[in-house]
């Protein structure tokens, strides 16, 4: 299992420095690999759903094979480093490239800051960068809702899930998860072009996020008072509303957040979670919950690690 020191350093590195430039960012490279295979197989797309599924499966397997091979080779090189401190730093840096702590906070906070400054049009434009819905006609409460929904969902996708797989499967685990998540983001759409071509990435993403999403939700419940929430209401949201979103995973963190802070999160025509007025203060509190979840995750894992190895 991964040392808690590496986990902590990874978080600190990402929190301070944020995302790497696109030219040297591993996730961008993974995206380029996905685009390469999609371009090769694009001409083979047809109205035959079975063919589309087969070609999508070939793309998925190819991408995962390349990512695993590359990271396995990198890990061999890292293991040849004699200095343990340098080895820890390199390992931590690489894992930090699979998470998006700083960027998640920045993108989620921007719409809130615009609303605070009463600049609704800029808030609509900034929230459009983090959600797939049309934001042109959203009012203030639905802009706040969209920001919080995105932030709570991405606690899992951007942070907890890659760390979870790094803990149990090392660098390969973190990067394979990131590859699956990136393929789902690029190919996992329910439209004519991607319905079957992106089917496998979507299924794998649901499977990969099943445990991490529930860990994130449980941490939001347990430590609700630290971000101004209510444990009892948070637990009620987890149990009764976590399953109400189209995604089998994203609803748990959103439902906990909504109920814990006594507010309503709504994607019109899809779901409505919680019951209460959504305010700017509650929105900022929801972003603080990201810090709470991350550091509670690290602390609890550190305790488990010490008990497992030393007792």
UniProtKB/Swiss-Prot annotation:
User: Membrane-crossing residues?
Assistant: 53-73, 76-96, 157-177, 288-308
Main subcellular localisation? membrane
| Keyword Chaperone annotated | no
* Keywords linked to the UniProt accession: Cell membrane, Cobalamin biosynthesis, Membrane, Transmembrane, Transmembrane helix
Keyword check for Cell division: no
Topology of the protein relative to the lipid bilayer: Multi-pass membrane protein
GO cellular component, alphabetical, reads: plasma membrane
Q: In what pathway does it function? A: Cofactor biosynthesis; adenosylcobalamin biosynthesis
Q: Which GO terms describe its molecular function?
A: ABC-type vitamin B12 transporter activity; threonine-phosphate decarboxylase activity
Q: Where in the cell is it found?
A: Cell membrane
Q: One of this protein's GO BP terms? A: cobalamin biosynthetic process
Recorded family membership: Belongs to the CobD/CbiB family.
| Role description | Converts cobyric acid to cobinamide by the addition of aminopropanol on the F carboxylic group.
By what name is this protein known?
Probable cobalamin biosynthesis protein CobD
The species this protein belongs to is: Methanococcus aeolicus (strain ATCC BAA-1280 / DSM 17508 / OCM 812 / Nankai-3)
Gene name, please?
A: cobD
């Amino acid at each position: 299992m991964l040392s808690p020191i590496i986990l902590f350093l990874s978080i600190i590195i990402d929190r301070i420095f944020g995302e790497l430039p696109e030219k040297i960012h591993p996730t961008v490279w993974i995206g380029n690999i996905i685009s390469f295979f999609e371009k090769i197989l694009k001409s083979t797309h047809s109205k035959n759903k079975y063919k589309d599924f087969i070609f999508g499966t070939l793309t998925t397997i190819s991408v995962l094979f390349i990512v695993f091979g590359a990271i396995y080779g990198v890990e061999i090189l890292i293991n040849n480093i004699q200095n343990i401190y340098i080895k820890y730093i390199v390992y931590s840096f690489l894992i930090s490239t699979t998470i998006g702590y700083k960027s998640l906070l920045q993108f989620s906070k921007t719409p809130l800051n615009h609303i605070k400054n009463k600049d609704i049009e800029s808030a609509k434009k900034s929230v459009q960068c983090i959600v797939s819905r049309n934001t042109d006609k959203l009012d203030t409460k639905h802009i706040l809702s969209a920001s919080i929904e995105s932030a709570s969902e991405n606690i899992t996708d951007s942070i907890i899930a890659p760390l979870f797989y790094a803990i149990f499967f090392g660098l390969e685990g973190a990067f394979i998860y990131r590859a699956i998540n990136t393929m789902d983001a690029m190919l996992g759409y329910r439209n004519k072009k991607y319905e079957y071509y992106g089917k496998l990435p979507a299924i794998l993403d649901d499977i990969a996020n099943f445990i991490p999403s529930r860990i994130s939700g449980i941490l939001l419940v347990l430590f609700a008072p630290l971000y101004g929430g209510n444990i009892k209401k948070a637990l009620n949201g987890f149990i009764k509303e976590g399953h109400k979103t189209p995604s089998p995973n994203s609803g748990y963190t959103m439902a906990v957040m909504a109920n814990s802070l006594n507010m309503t999160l709504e994607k019109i025509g899809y779901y409505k979670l919680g019951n209460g007025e959504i305010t700017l203060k509650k929105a900022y509190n929801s972003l603080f919950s990201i810090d709470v979840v991350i550091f509670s995750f690290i602390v609890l894992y550190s305790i488990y690690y010490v008990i497992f190895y030393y007792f």
